[in-house]
Amino acid sequence: MRKVAAAAVVTLLVAALVTSVGVRRVTAHLAHGATAPEFALQAAQGGDVATVDLKEALAKGPVVLYFFPKSFTSGCTTEAHLFSEHIADFKKLNATVIGVSGDDIETQKKFSTEACRSAFRVASDPGLKVAKLYDAQLADKYANRTSYVIAQDGTIAYAYTDLDAAKHVDNTLDALKSLSAARK
């Protein structure tokens, strides 16, 4: 019960932050064609921890990099579930999915199994250093809900920012399909 109440409070705080920072900040992200900043972060998948490196992930194909405000809040859990439910679709497009928030790695270990269903890596970005590089910081302690599709050449192929988690999966899948069609 306390976790539910705490999650509700965090959700309300994030909503209040969105209101206070204004529309411009909520919709900011790196531009199409920009070079994606390289990074390496500790990440969890299925409760196991390893380093996730953008350069290594891009060697295998495009990367869907999505930032979210806080693990175990309702919107972030919903978004993680949606990504996990569609992981086979991402794999068909040879894409790697990586989730990122400012939560510590111990929290991400649990989130990777419970919310992400062990389907993809979820990284810990303490201090939101990587979120800042990607113009995905909502407030001091929270990343914005921003999704990127990074082409294999390391450029931003698609960017989408919206605190409503519902469209991030469909939009990134559509962007990957367009990217795949353009390569043919």
Please annotate each region the language model reported:
Residues 1-9:
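Bacterial N-terminal signal peptides that target proteins for export
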Residues 9-17:
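Bacterial N-terminal signal peptides
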Residues 16-43:
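N-proximal helix/coil linker or "cap" segments that precede and/or mark the start of modular domains
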Residues 37, 62, 144-146:
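Short loop/turn microsegments at loop-to-beta-strand junctions
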Residues 40-62:
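A short beta-strand-turn-helix
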Residues 54-83:
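Short active-site neighborhood of thiol/selenol oxidoreductases, capturing the structured segment around
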Residues 77-116, 126-132:
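Structural microenvironment flanking redox-active thiols in thiol-disulfide oxidoreductases
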Residues 143-184:
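Thiol-/selenol-based redox modules, centered on thioredoxin-like
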